[in-house]
Amino acid sequence: MGIKKRSFLKKGLILGLSCMMIGSTVTITSAAQESKSLTEFANVLDVSADPKEAIYGTYSTNEYNNFSDLGAWHGYYLHDKSATDLYGGFAGPVIIAEEYPVNLSDSINKINLEKITAAGIESIDLTKATTQEIYYPGRLEQIYDLKDLTLKLKLIFGTNRTALIETVIENKTDEELKLNVSWDGHLFTYYTNPNNKMGTTLTKENNGIRVNFETIRSTWNYMTTEENSFDIVLNEDDITTEISDDLLSYTITRNEPVVIDANSKYETYQTQSFTYTTDERTTEKQNVVDLLENPNKYFEENNNRWQGYVDTIFENKTNVNENYQKAAVKSIETLMTNWFSPAGAIKHDGIVPSMSYKWFIGMWAWDSWKQVVATTYFNEELAKNNVRALFDYQITSDDTVRPQDAGAIIDCIFYNQNEDRGGDGGNWNERNSKPALAAWAVENVYRQTGDKEFLKEMYPKLVAYHNWWYTNRDIDQNGIAEYGGMVHETCYDWTGYGYEIGQVVEGFGTVNDQGFVLDTNGERIVCPEAGIEAAAWESGMDNATRFDREGNGPDDKGIEIYTVRNDSHDPIGYVINQESVDLNAYLYAEKGFLKSMAEELGYKADAEKYTKEAKQLQEYINENMYDEETGFYYDVQTNEDGSVKKLLVNR
């Protein structure tokens, strides 16, 4: 059955893009007009910067926004007007040291011009120019307007590893203009503070330079290997490259002057590539050849792609309030900058919450579903692949680490897996899942694209994930789920939550030499703080007061942890003593989405099953989780066997 595509703005998802809020609507009436040009959306997102080694500003967030595209793992800024030492090049780049943003330079490559006349050589001072620094959707531009010439720089991403830069010098005079042309750049030596050396050096390459990296595995700050490489390649044949003795700065000089006829122009191009492995670098070298041989093709394709994004969201409806238009474009720019292509353990393209925040260069089973719904309106393949990226690591029954969690989607994935998986990453998290929004995301992709093959691909995976909630997160098996956590080492380590070896913990026991507390059967007990933290993270609400251990008021016994067991009495997870209304509302909606998918795929029995289950869950929520006096829904406190229930109106 064909699915009619929905209008992006007409359905009011413009605010959903920027805020990622479910259910926000904006009523807009509009008529077809000419499409909006990309040049009408200059600098709707501020990427101006004067980047430094100490990249972070407030809350471990990059002090400046940057631009990236196509899933590249590096990005650029426009220089601040006041940062005149950066004139002549694009500020940056910022690279992702596998999981962390780092400024490689304040300007890795700047052009220098000298005017040659009969009277001698005159250095051209770009700080005397009238300048424009512009971020259009999909590209950065700089314009330096001087008396005799205009210098124009444009930057786009040509591939998911390479930026393509166009340099145009226009002779504004009626006479021939002769110029000496060179480029220079340098490396930062440390990240965050002077004690953290980046281990980078420069070497000469054909038609350019290479930044070499050392193997540095700082789990929580900076992770590189000797295979990493940042390469600059110019489409200039006759050049001389000089590198400083400390291998941190360089100059590339054209051996012959550039001669520009009256009222004519000179064009040249370069690429800047950041790759993680030798194989990536080899592949990208071939891509660079094509980029430099056919630059106009790539600039045209880039413009068409971004114009397509804008045309799709407006669907030629351009009399929408200007602020809403800008918000929509700004949202797309944000999503595309946060697009990351396969690298390391990440197998499919996806979107991270923020390229700027230190701890957010990964993909979460929570943020991703919302990003998928937004992205499917203008980049359908990226939306599909973002779903796949998380399901690539869906737990299976033959998993070597946690087969008891078959069906689960783990909390988040990063470039590096954790030690249990043979990696050395610290951010990869399998301790908990996230709220059940995956089916909602897939349903939205299908309704937007009509791709039944994608629906067939995802349906059994979604069913397995849905079932997991009822095998591993339902302590009394009443069909009502609770938030909790996986069987995970961090949940048993009491010393990680402020307890000391030998400490007697009232109601639990003594912390042994391994940091564990054992019950009378010798089984490890989940540390309450660890268990509550995992459950709170699983909710997506993290530090919400509804998860305070002490509860609220004299009649509230607070949070307790219950172990969920299989038929062999083996632990397969744990939950808190709360049937959460939000989780079960998500699961109710998910049953509806699964019913709809089953109908589309012709699975009649499944459709009937989910219809029945949804009705039962709806009745439970309305009868047991709603308080008529206050007019709100609340969580229900439960004991382990489900014989005692209490509506938590006090929270």
Each predicted region: which residue ranges?
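Well-ordered alpha-helical scaffold segments within catalytic/enzyme domains
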Residues: 311-320, 369-382, 437-452, 585-604
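Terminal accessory carbohydrate-recognition/targeting modules of carbohydrate-active enzymes
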Residues: 31-323, 358-359, 366, 377-381
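Carbohydrate-binding/catalytic loop surfaces
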Residues: 347-362, 404-431, 479-575, 630-651
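Hydrophobic core
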Residues: 17-25
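Helix-terminus loop motifs that line ligand-binding clefts
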Residues: 344-350, 363, 379-495, 622-636
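Conserved oxyanion/phosphate-binding beta-strand-loop segments in alpha/beta enzyme cores
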Residues: 124-136, 314-358, 397-404
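Extended, well-ordered alpha-helical scaffold segments
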Residues: 283-309, 323-330, 379-392, 452-470, ...
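Catalytic cores of carbohydrate-active enzymes
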Residues: 301, 463-498, 585-651
